[in-house]
């Protein structure tokens, strides 16, 4: 029962609409889906569930070398720097193996501590520490909007590893489809951009949220935070739970139009 259970099997290829050619001369998007579950050694009523759904390029009109570089950027965005060089499915398996090993160690230790505490305090009611040891991790990576040579790749992740509630994040990455490199916020803007762009972000937030709500938010966090994506409209910053508002407010997005950002953009990265 302790062996890893592969619940969905291998990759499921989902072709992009209207694309049917398998030629490297055309672009084909696929989605790799993987689901794992493993029970806790101490109690098989507790388990960890791991789910990955990752879009990547199966073929790319820019050629194989560029496709590999873009897919490396996707692996880095979804799984981390240490997995670059692996295919999406290989990275998914490697990450899952690590998470499962960590679960057995960390959740196992928590289980033993909960159980010892319960016994030491004479708890005789029907309670099991397995309640806090049902963990999960989910990662979804998908192509977002695109502007000129810049492609937004959106990574949503959520997890529960014990405690009152889980956590979730939605983080965009910008990939230059001309060279496969990840474009950071510092690449996108000229030096000295932080102060003026902070002002633009606050103006947009106050306009969208309303003055009363805006005043209750965490003003110190309303800065360019490096978690931004691009679209035809402008640059969108994503603020995670607790970053500029309470957990209940969730993920907050704010878009600043290109026209307002133009004086601060790095023309070597993006020419408007």
Name what the model sees in each region.
Residues 1-9:
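Bacterial N-terminal signal peptides that target proteins for export
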Residues 12-13:
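Repetitive helical segments and hydrophobic/amphipathic motifs
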Residues 17-21:
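C-terminal motif of bacterial Sec signal peptides marking the signal peptidase cleavage site
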Residues 22-272:
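Compositionally biased intrinsically disordered regions enriched in Thr/Gly
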């Amino acid at each position: 029962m302790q062996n890893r259970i592969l619940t969905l099997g291998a990759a499921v290829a989902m072709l992009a609409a209207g694309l049917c050619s398998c030629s490297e001369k055309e672009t084909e998007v696929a989605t790799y889906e993987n689901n794992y579950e493993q029970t806790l050694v101490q109690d098989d009523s507790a388990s960890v569930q791991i789910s990955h759904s990752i879009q990547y390029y199966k073929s790319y009109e820019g050629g194989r070398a560029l496709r590999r570089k873009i897919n490396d950027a996707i692996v880095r965005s979804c799984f981390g720097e240490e997995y670059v060089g692996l295919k999406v499915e290989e990275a998914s398996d490697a990450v899952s193996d690590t998470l499962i090993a960590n679960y057995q160690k960390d959740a196992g230790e928590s289980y033993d501590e909960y159980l010892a505490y319960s016994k030491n305090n004479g708890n005789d009611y029907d309670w099991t520490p397995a309640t806090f040891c049902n963990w999960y991790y989910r990662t979804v990576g998908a192509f977002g909007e695109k502007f000129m040579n810049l492609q937004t790749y959106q990574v949503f992740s959520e997890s529960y590893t014990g405690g009152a509630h889980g956590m979730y994040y939605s983080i965009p990455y910008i990939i230059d489809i001309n060279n496969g490199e990840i474009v950071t916020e510092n690449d996108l803007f000229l030096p000295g951009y932080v102060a003026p762009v902070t002002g633009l972000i606050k103006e947009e937030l106050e306009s969208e949220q309303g003055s009363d709500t805006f005043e209750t938010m965490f003003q110190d966090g309303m800065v360019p935070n490096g978690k931004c994506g691009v679209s035809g409209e402008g640059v969108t910053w994503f603020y995670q739970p607790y970053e500029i508002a309470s957990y209940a407010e969730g993920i907050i997005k704010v878009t600043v139009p290109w026209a307002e950002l133009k004086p601060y953009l790095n023309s070597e990265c993006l020419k408007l």
